[in-house]
Amino acid sequence: DGSIPEKSVHKICAIAVAGIAGSLREIADSIEHDREYLLSCALDFERWSDSGFTVPDFFDSLSAFHPEKNRVDGTPHLVVFPMYTQNGSTDRFVEAVVLEIIWPEFIAELEKNYSNPAFVPVRFIDFTPGYLTNSAVIFPESVAVTPRVPEGAEPGTPAELPVFSWGGIFADREAARFRKVVQTASEVTRLELPADAQELLQNQQLAEHTFVMWDLIHDRTHMRGDLPFDPFMIKQRMPFFLYGLEEMRCDLTAFRECVKLSRDKSVDAETRKFASLVQYAVLFDRIFRFPLTGTRKRNYDSVAGQLLFAYLHKSHVLHWTDTQLTIDWAELPDVVVSL
């Protein structure tokens, strides 16, 4: 939970916290758009130290951090919180991440039709060991906060968490591991790739922007349409195979929309190009990366990939013959859309 019950280390922890708080105040002068958050974070650290390192409560600083309000390409942020990391540490440690926003012009235009105001695609600049993991997201839900009764609320009003208004997705890490795994998997399976798919695997920035487009549409779909299970089960990702269906639902929605965009002559050429690349990204991430790099136990992302592979095989657009994988690229989009 982030608390430090061992009193014998409180002195050295207090010295460390004083250093963090001082650094945050110093850095606040250099990052004007994060100034309120950084100063609030320094206070939260000092309050935690003064409390004797009980369970940390960073409610105020988390409430002050709003990267979603300044989605301009290259905008830097420093994020410091006691937090756990998805696919990483389940304990709450103080983690620091320096990141920058990825927001190409075509995404800014696309978002007018695919509104997702909480979506914050980012790339790593530097990070503490909690992100030396498979984690490719930074979510406010992972930060140590204690629910509070809203100011001015009626007596008896239950305590609430702050409103979570953003979610950070590290498109650079997604793109890099996608390129590495898919390049090797296509060589092992002797899959002949079209020229634009080869370019996607060779170009990191191209892959990053492709993932931003995919994530923009995928992420918003989690809040739209019919869920395949009770929404209260989302946090638990249970039962895991049904969560695989939910991930497939969002991926197939993104795929379908990108097929529409790629075929619409009224859409600009850059957006149409990335709409075609997203189709490769969805296919390869699902049939290669998730099953190959994830854990073998209760891996809902892998289940979704296996379902897609099986459907494409049954529909005769994917063939595994004499240890070689072949795909009917012309027929593929409509078959995936039919699923």
Write out the residue ranges for each language-model feature.
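Noncatalytic N-terminal accessory/assembly modules of large enzymes
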Residues: 1-36
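Active-site recognition of the HExxH zinc-binding catalytic motif
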Residues: 211-227, 235
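Long, well-structured alpha-helical subdomains associated
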Residues: 4, 208, 255, 259-339
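An active-site-proximal "capping" alpha-helix that borders the catalytic cofactor pocket
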Residues: 243-260
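A short secondary-structure junction motif
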Residues: 223-227, 231, 286, 290
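Post-HEXXH active-site segment of zinc metalloproteases
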Residues: 226-248
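Contiguous, non-catalytic segments that form substrate-binding/exosite surfaces or channel walls
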Residues: 32-198
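Short pre-active-site segment immediately N-terminal to the catalytic Zn-binding motif
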Residues: 197-214
